[in-house]
Amino acid sequence: MSVVANPLHPLFAAGVEDIDLREALGSTEVREIERLMDEKSVLVFRGQPLSQDQQIAFARNFGPLEGGFIKVNQRPSRFKYAELADISNVSLDGKVAQRDAREVVGNFANQLWHSDSSFQQPAARYSMLSAVVVPPSGGDTEFCDMRAAYDALPRDLQSELEGLRAEHYALNSRFLLGDTDYSEAQRNAMPPVNWPLVRTHAGSGRKFLFIGAHASHVEGLPVAEGRMLLAELLEHATQREFVYRHRWNVGDLVMWDNRCVLHRGRRYDISARRELRRATTLDDAVV
């Protein structure tokens, strides 16, 4: 069975039709989705009201699952699977959390451009985010194409970036927002790792920028110079021409490739309920 995909952006991202993710996928469908991911890097599946079991089963088609920030979070989950990340403003009692609650404050970092789990090696490959409850307005998610962004860099800057590496740290994005209320154990739960600023995508052979809010500095450069370089690259990569904005409906599942896509949530009224669940697969690359 072929998988039908319609473009959502001139450079990347596609909507997938005529497939029911609640049912077990055959090997042909899995391979076709992987092929589309190599080409489009973001796939949108509408009308997929998945249970936790169904979301986990779908995600496991694409490799082992990873927990990412769970090691730092060190708090109970509302979900039956530790591998499901709670992207919501809902507390353990099922009510919308208070504005200053950890569930809310911690998730503000999701509104910075980032790649899931770039703070570990191996990092994440695919993330699959399922919309359970969406607010009346706002709360969209944006994605930017880091392969196209690299291609559009001046050749001299491309050459300058070769061989440079950035340090990524799990709490860097939180610290940027003044969210520093973490114990020593939490701060040390995931030591920093470093990644090349430019990597090659295994599925397409294309080069891409690997940066984002987890990247704290560039190794071998003065801190200020390195941070300005990271800021310049991020400003370039997140121009409108490289960005797809997804407006959520209940039952949407969006799947993206963390290696060559950055994403961020957008602002919404945090007194309105917003519930999304994310499953993420582990990559096999250590560079």
Curated annotation (Swiss-Prot):
Post-translational modification summary for this protein: Hydroxylated on Trp-113; inactivates the enzyme.
Activity control: Activated by ascorbate.
Modified residues (3-hydroxytryptophan): W113
GO biological process, one term: 2,4-dichlorophenoxyacetic acid catabolic process
Enzyme's top EC category: oxidoreductase
Cofactor note: Binds 1 Fe(2+) ion per subunit.
Required cofactor(s): Fe(2+)
Protein name: Alpha-ketoglutarate-dependent 2,4-dichlorophenoxyacetate dioxygenase
Lineage per the UniProt record: Bacteria, Pseudomonadati, Pseudomonadota, Betaproteobacteria, Burkholderiales
